[in-house]
Structures are given as C-alpha cells and as structure tokens.
C-alpha cells in the first residue's frame, strides 16, 4: 500500500511537472551553452567549441561563465538533440525524468531514518513543490545534479557492512555528481573526512581500520579513473571557475543574508511564507543539533556547500541550494519530533498529529499551486517565450541568412546568439568595444541589461546602419 502511494505521488508529480513545461525558455543564457556543448559532442567539434567559448568570454565586457560547463549534462542532452534538434520542450524531458529518480532516491534515504508514513509525507513536500516543479522548465543541470547528489548521500550513509560493489557505486555516484557540476566533488571530501575520524575512533580495531582504508581507496580509485576518462574525452574549461574567487571575504559578507533568505523560496515568495520559513528554520537548527552525531555527512556537506557558494561572486537564487533542501527539510522534521518528545507524554499523540497536519497542509497547498500553474500553462498552449519567440527567431534568421558566416555579432545574450546562429558573438556595455563586431543587436525591452539601450546608442557616435527592426529588437550593421 505504501509503495502504491509513493508510485501515485511520483506519477502525479510527473504529470504536473510535464504540464508545466513550455515551448520556450527564460532569457538567461547558461542553458544555451549546455546545448552548444551537446551539439559539439554530436559533431565531434568540442575543441572548436572551446575556441568559440574563449572568444566570447575574452572579448566581452565581463565574464560570462566558465569556458565549458562539466560535460555530464550536455552528454545527457546530446541524444535528445540528435533526435529532436532545437526543441526546448524535448530538451527539458531529461530533467523531468531525473526529478522522478530524485524522488525515489529521497524516499529510500528517508526510509532508513523515519517511519514510512513520515518518509512518504516528506517526499510529498518535494513531489508537489511549486519552486522545483516550475524549475523543470529550465534546461539546466541542477535537477540531474540533485538526483546524483541524493543518490550519493544514499549510498554514502547506508548502514551495515559494505561490499566492494557498494564502494564502487559510491565512487561512481560521486563522479557523476561532479560530472554534472564541479561542486559535486565536495561529497568526496565529506566522505573522506568522516571516514578519517571513524578510523581514528576505531584505530585499535584492525579489521575496522582495514575496511575503512580499503573502502576509501576503492571510492577514490573509481572516482579518479572516471575523472581521468572524462579529461581524456572532453576538453576542460572548469579552471575558469576558480578565477572568480578573488575577493572571498567581501563576497561572503554580501552573500550570507541572501543565502539565508533564499531557503524561504522553497515555500513561496510572499512575506507570509517567509515568516513560516523562519519558524521552520528554528526546527532545522534544533534537528541538526540533535542529530549531528548520527548524520555527520549531512552536516558536513551542508556546511561545506554553503561556504563554497557564499564565496562565489555570482548569486543564482534558489537553484544553488537545491541539493541542501532534502537535508534542510529532514532536519526540520526531526527538530519538530525532538520538541514533541520533550512534552509531557499525554501530549505526544496530539503533538504528532499537529506535525503531520502541518506537513500535509503544506503538501496540499503545494499541489494546488502547482496544479493551477500547470493548468494555466496548458491553457496557454505551452507558450513560446524568451529567446524562442517569433521576434527573436526573425533576428536569428536575418543573421544566418543575410550576413557573412564569420561576421561577429554584439548581443546582450551572446551564448544564445551562438546557439541559434553559430556566429561568433560578444557582449558589450562599452561604445568602443562594440567596434569589435560587424553587427549590433539591441533589445528594446531590457534596458541596460548587458547592453547599451537603443535610446542611448546614438551617444556612442558609431557608424551604424539599421537593417532590421521589430517589436523587440533593432539590428544594426557596423560600418567600417
């Protein structure tokens, strides 16, 4: 019966999530680079991609991102692109499937720690969560990363005697987590730190010491072999991440409040949800304190993840804390149970009922909100938005059909332009830098967002010849 409930929840989550997917995409252009990397895998042009990426990054006004994202997610997109081409809807399907996989892993992770009814309840919170289900409309690596990080935690924290195959599984799971996002390597660090202290605590037990050493060595060996294979198959561009950690202290000082508050978006955007989050946060602290000895890997991963991200200069909103949300909600529930256990015994049943009622209500509200969003999307015929709308397509077609193949385009989202036209593209917020291009495309809707607005471009005194204009864009040829 309980497994049937889990299956029903996951099925409902898949239906609602699939109904939330649109035929367009938001204007952020990280997604474009994942798709371009996937295309380069299929065409065998990964080295040419790296050259193109270096040009876009080096010639633009500011840093746009790493030269290449980890190749795991582009590898997942490649077969979809091979079959469906540039179809945003199809390219979102891997995220949907990996989200279902995450829910299964999360249930198994909780089943070892909570009564089955609580495991199902906590999974329901995630299965119907509006933030996460709406995020499935993004072509980004965060959801596959969430799956692999949760799978890694599941394997790393499994109780009982571990076989060689189990350690191989841990090493592979951690590798695939890092293959999605470099920060997945924190899981390997967490495992080794916890195993080191376990070794110290059992140093007089030769059998346990040998088990720890052999197990840790196996995990590291599997990870290293897979990582070397990755380096041999794909060019590396991740080192450009580290150049962004320049002013750690100032970055952290500004980011700490942002990362504290961003957890509230798991519940909702309104002030009422934020106040509810503050209450849940107290229970989270209580649960983390009470279970620190039982869950050292959870605690260590949470702390290291926060440290790494508060020192990273680019705040990306809730998606950067997705891997921590299962730990956060788990500890919050444990904090509530800890408080109930301290009440007089006659209040235990009513206290437990209150906790269950609270989470059931939250799950119900989440399901209603997500269902309404999905229904509105279907009523809108899965609207085509952002860089895939007709006005944008008109610009891409002009660039592809009416300009020389190697002409340089200046555009506020250069990686999108590269994806759609294969033209070398840069971003410029300076008049002089615009001269590096052959064509200038300005958005009429975004103001000073990584561009000089159309209404201010005349002040640059550039030799511009307008060649196309529609409701969203104006295109200029830059004269010699």
List where the protein language model places each region.
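Signature aromatic-anchored transmembrane alpha helix within multi-pass, membrane-resident enzymes
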Residues: 2, 6-11, 172, 216-224, ...
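Perimembrane helix-loop-helix junctions
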Residues: 3, 158-163, 187-221
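Short helix- or helix-capping micro-motifs
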Residues: 13, 119-130, 134, 154, ...
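Short acidic/glycine- and proline-prone juxtamembrane loop motifs at membrane-interface regions
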Residues: 28, 131, 137-144, 317
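Hydrophobic, aromatic-rich transmembrane alpha-helices
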Residues: 103-104, 202, 264-295, 299, ...
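Membrane-interface transmembrane helices that cradle and orient dolichyl/undecaprenyl
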Residues: 111-116, 152-167, 201, 290-292
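Membrane-lumen/periplasm interface segments of specific transmembrane helices
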Residues: 178, 197, 210-286, 363-373
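Membrane-embedded, lumen/periplasm-facing catalytic core of multi-pass transferases
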Residues: 355-415
């Amino acid at each position: 019966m309980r497994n049937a409930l889990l299956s029903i929840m996951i099925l409902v989550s898949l239906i609602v999530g699939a109904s939330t997917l649109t035929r367009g995409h938001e204007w952020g252009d990280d997604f474009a680079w994942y798709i371009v990397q996937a295309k380069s895998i299929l065409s065998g042009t990964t080295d040419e991609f790296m050259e193109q990426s270096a040009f876009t990054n080096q010639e633009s006004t500011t840093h746009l991102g790493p030269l290449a994202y980890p190749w795991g997610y582009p590898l997942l997109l490649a077969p979809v692109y091979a079959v469906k081409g540039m179809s945003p809807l199809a390219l979102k399907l891997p995220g949907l499937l990996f989200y279902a996989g995450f829910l299964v892993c999360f249930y198994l992770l909780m089943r070892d720690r909570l009564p089955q009814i609580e495991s199902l309840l906590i999974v329901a919170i995630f299965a119907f969560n509006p933030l996460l289900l709406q995020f499935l409309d993004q072509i980004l690596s965060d959801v596959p990363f969430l799956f692999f990080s949760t799978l890694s935690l599941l394997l790393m924290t499994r109780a009982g005697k571990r076989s060689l195959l189990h350690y191989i599984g841990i090493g592979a799971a951690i590798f695939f987590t890092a293959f999605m996002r470099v920060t997945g390597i924190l899981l390997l660090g967490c495992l080794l730190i916890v195993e080191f202290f376990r070794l110290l605590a059992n140093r007089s037990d030769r059998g346990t010491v040998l088990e720890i050493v052999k197990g840790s060595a196996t995990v590291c060996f599997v990870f290293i072999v897979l990582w070397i294979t990755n380096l041999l198959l794909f060019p590396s561009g991740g080192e450009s991440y580290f150049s962004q950690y320049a002013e750690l202290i100032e970055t952290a000082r500004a980011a700490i409040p942002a990362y504290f508050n961003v957890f509230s978006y798991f519940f909702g955007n309104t002030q009422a949800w934020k106040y509810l989050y503050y209450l849940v946060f107290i229970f989270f602290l209580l649960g983390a304190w009470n279970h620190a000895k039982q869950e050292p890997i959870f605690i260590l991963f949470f702390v290291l993840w926060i440290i790494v991200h508060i020192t990273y200069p680019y705040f990306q909103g809730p998606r950067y804390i997705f891997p921590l949300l299962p730990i956060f909600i788990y500890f919050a529930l444990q904090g509530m149970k800890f408080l109930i256990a301290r009440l007089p015994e006659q209040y235990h049943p009513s206290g437990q009922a209150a906790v269950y009622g609270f989470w059931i209500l939250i799950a119900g509200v989440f399901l209603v909100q997500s269902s309404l969003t999905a229904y509105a999307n279907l009523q809108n015929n899965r609207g085509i938005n952002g860089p895939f709308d007709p006005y944008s397509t008109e610009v891409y077609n002009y660039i592809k059909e009416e300009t020389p193949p190697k002409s340089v385009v200046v555009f506020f989202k250069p990686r999108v332009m590269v994806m759609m036209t294969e033209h070398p593209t840069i971003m410029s917020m300076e008049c002089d830098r615009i001269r590096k291009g052959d064509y200038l495309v300005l958005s009429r809707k975004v103001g000073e967002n990584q561009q000089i607005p159309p209404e201010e471009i005349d002040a640059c005194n550039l030799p511009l010849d307008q060649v196309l204009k529609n409701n969203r864009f104006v295109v200029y040829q830059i004269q010699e």
